[in-house]
Amino acid sequence: MRRRRSALLAGSFALLAVVGGIAWQTKLRRPEGRLTGVGPRMVSNQTSQPVSLYGENLRRGMKLRLSEPFDRAVPMTVVDARHAYARLPSDLTLPVGTAQVTAALSIDGQRTRSEVGLTVVNDGAFADYTLLVRSGDVLWAASTTTDALVRLDPSTGEVSHLPGGDGPSALAAWTEADGQPRLAVAHTWTPELWILDGRTGAVLRTLRAPVYATGVAVDPHRRLVVLAETVENTVRALSLDDGRELWRRDVLPDPRPLALAGDTVVVGSQGSGELETLGLDDGRTAESLGPRPGTPIVGGHTEPHARDVMGGKAPRSLLWSSSLGKLFVTSIGPNIGPNPQRMEVSMNGGVGVVDLAARRFERHLGFGAGVTEGMALDEGSKRLYVADVALGLVRALDAAALVSGDDGARKAELWRLPVLPPPDFPLAREAADYGVNGRAGAELHSGPRALALSASGAQLYVLDRFTATVAVVEDARSSQPRLERQIPLETSIGPRERRLGQVLYYADMGRSGMSCDSCHLEGHDEGILFEKTHPLRIYRSPTVRGTRETPPYFTPASTGSLAETSRVVGDRNRYMNPTLTESEVRQLTLFSATVTNLPNPYRGPDGAPPVSIALPGGGIGRPLEGRRLFDSKADCVRCHPPPLFTTDQDLSTRGHFIDVGTPRAFPLRTGDQETVFRGVGVPSLVGAWDVFPMLTTGLAGFREENGRAVPADRVPLRAMIERYSAPPHGNAAALDAQEKADLLAYLLTL
């Protein structure tokens, strides 16, 4: 019996050895998983980021490995042997002095060397203060990139940093019926609206709110809080007390600033340049407003071209005067379209006046230079203060004169005050080069972005974006205001080269009205322009986000790198007054190269597309089914291959301009456009969910109507599929309705 048991045991061990050997040999023969690409190739570390992974022999259970300086393993969601997704964590921390790093990506445990790199931009340590409000006796400022919410007591200069949530993106202050000051904080990535004690910053309650919030306004009497967001492009009203959604309305693309105006709220569309009014009680909308052909332009080089106006440009700030019954809007001015003189510099920054009751954009006061943004109004003295981020100036205007008529508006400026940067702030070039030959002064390094008034109106507070300071202007109501002091919000400006590149991106050194930001607001798209290139015609103004990987630039191609673009366009913007130095080219190139795509909001918590998504404009789409169609029946992948979905991603296929049968010119005064056609470039589809308009002409988004450009498509991706996707531009026209919905769903997740 013992011998039999021993024999059985021996046989069992032998069998196990054989099975184990077979398994071991099978494992050895199993091909090693490896990565071949990642999209996007550059991300920000300011929040968690979804990425698409491409490779060979990918299997479930694999992890993504990030090399030094992170040395992290991240879970992967593997779809098939060639496709996977991951979500990078939000704590990829880098030293304050580091602008960016490139880490190697590989499969965790991969033995062969990986050639796939991912650049991580250090936005999480690059403070960028753009928001300022007064609540009671204290000021509140916020930096979206660094998640900073800052309390500032201007009487003492005391600065306190509080957690701001994931990407604080909009602030609103008000006073409750019992006299208590309150502060609302909306967010880009935290799906919450915070209600804070306006004195201390203590969180009183948290309301569920949409992500990608871009504007917030509070009506304490109606107990309403109104938010704008840019994923679904809606404005929503929530109960201030319990957060219930009271109404929701679709609005024009990329809604940004909000202003309460009596029983309505006004929202400005960055994509279309239009204004919309919504009733506070029910969200009812009226026809949009904006500059129209013939809208008076008072001052600046575009004044003779009022008849050539084809629409508006992005409203940068809105402010309602209850005493004057007018709305003020800052922008780079009415959008000048094709004209017999071929004048193609539409930028004329200033302030517009809108009569909401008459539904009329009354006039635009142009300053002829700079980019006007933030505003503050002293209702008592009827003084309107405006900040110029491109020139480093603050102006005071007689608001009553501004609304009185064109003649009054021409004389409305009361004073202008340069806001010089602190003495230890670096300059982009020699100090002697500023303020001569008609150039802007060294004050352009400060970047006045937002304004707030003291309760008495005697002090004006200026949030300077580039220096991260709040400047205190005394005697604001007098004819001789003075810059009393500057209060720093941060101890470091971050990487010197990148910060100076930011200054150069926004600056109007040559006082031409042109800057990188005037065409590409905050590094993104901004409607259409009758533009400074040849052939001279109407083009869409494309995004800068993620473009470092996809030269050449312009249509037809005129610059082959970001550095060449910085040189050529930078010099042109200044009218060569002066030409950029080599260091300025380097700094501007660095900043432009660190403008990243936003995290895709259509991805799930694991970074992968969900099984299905609700589509903007209606319907349900299945992204993974859409990918299969993209790669086959719809024939999109031929010109838009992954990982960046453009043939410009690789040197061997870069710069091939083609004719795919899409419209060649925008049909507005074509006799004043150069309609010669040399082909179109292939845009990247990464981040396409947030692009408006599409096509080189902008005709997936706008149409011509009565001599102007009218926003026509709220979802340009849908317009592309339904109107512009017959051969030779792919073959989505052959898809049935559900297949088109699936393809749209996939494109939204790129």
Predicted regions and their residues:
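Short loop/turn segments that connect beta-strands within beta-propeller blades
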Residues: 153-157, 197-201, 239-243, 279-283, ...
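Short glycine/acidic-enriched loop and turn motifs that connect beta-strands
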Residues: 146-148, 190-191, 232-233, 272-274, ...
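Residue-level detector of Asp-centered blade-edge/turn motifs that repeat once per structural unit
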Residues: 134-136, 174-180, 218-222, 260-262, ...
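Beta-strand/beta-sandwich contexts
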Residues: 20-62, 70, 109-129
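Surface loop/turn motifs at the tips and blade-to-blade linkers of beta-strand repeat domains
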Residues: 121-125, 162-166, 206-210, 248-252, ...
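Periplasmic c-type cytochrome electron-transfer domains
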Residues: 21, 130, 312-317, 321, ...
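Conserved beta-propeller blade signature
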Residues: 139-141, 182-184, 224-226, 265-267, ...
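Beta-strand-rich domains and repeat architectures in extracellular enzymes and scaffolds
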Residues: 123-147, 169
